[in-house]
């Protein structure tokens, strides 16, 4: 099955981004001690995992081997900066940035992919990501307010 190279590139990027954000949310859950925040982070990781498998199915349907697409080696710079980044920014903000990147990829895919089943999937993912962005913003503001009040 032939597919536009831009769509293929964006799908591959989306797949790796879902994997990365899932891991980011799991890291955030491990780093946070507030139960409601842990639930939120773990729930978001599950959502990203489901989205990852949906996109991997799309890639398989169009004849792309998913194993060839997934970035095998972790980004050393990312691992090294994780602790530093946690100290500088709250975890909600960090995940918010990643979700905004996902939203941009999904919007591009909706714009250029004309296959209805795939665009419906992108729209469902976009809705979930948009909800997550709102929640991350809300939690981030709450965390910043608590930090401000405690100082």
Tell me what each language-model feature is.
Residues 57-93, 97, 101:
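Carboxylate-rich helix-loop segments that flank metal/cofactor sites and access channels
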Residues 1-5, 57, 127, 131-134, ...:
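Terminal, compositionally biased segments
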Residues 31, 58-61, 65, 112, ...:
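A short linear boundary/processing microfeature
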Residues 39-71, 136-147:
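Conserved alpha-helical segments that form or flank metal/cofactor-binding pockets of metalloenzymes
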Residues 38-46, 93, 120-130:
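Short, charged, amphipathic alpha-helical segments
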Residues 1-32, 88-113, 131, 135:
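Alpha-helical bundle segments that constitute or directly flank the non-heme di-iron/ferroxidase center
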Residues 107-130, 148-150:
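Acidic interhelical loop/turn segments
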């Amino acid at each position: 099955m032939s597919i536009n190279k831009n769509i293929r590139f964006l799908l591959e990027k989306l797949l790796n981004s879902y994997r990365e954000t899932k891991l980011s949310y799991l890291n955030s859950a491990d780093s946070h001690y507030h139960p409601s925040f842990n639930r939120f982070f773990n729930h978001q990781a599950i959502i990203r995992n489901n989205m990852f498998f949906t996109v991997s199915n799309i890639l398989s349907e169009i004849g792309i081997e998913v194993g060839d697409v997934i970035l095998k080696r972790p980004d050393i710079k990312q691992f090294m900066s994780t602790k530093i980044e946690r100290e500088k920014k709250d975890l909600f903000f960090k995940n918010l940035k990643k979700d905004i990147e996902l939203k941009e990829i999904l919007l591009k895919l909706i714009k250029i992919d004309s296959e209805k089943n795939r665009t419906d999937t992108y729209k469902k993912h976009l809705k979930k990501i948009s909800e997550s962005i709102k929640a991350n913003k809300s939690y981030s503001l709450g965390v910043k307010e608590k930090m401000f009040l405690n100082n």
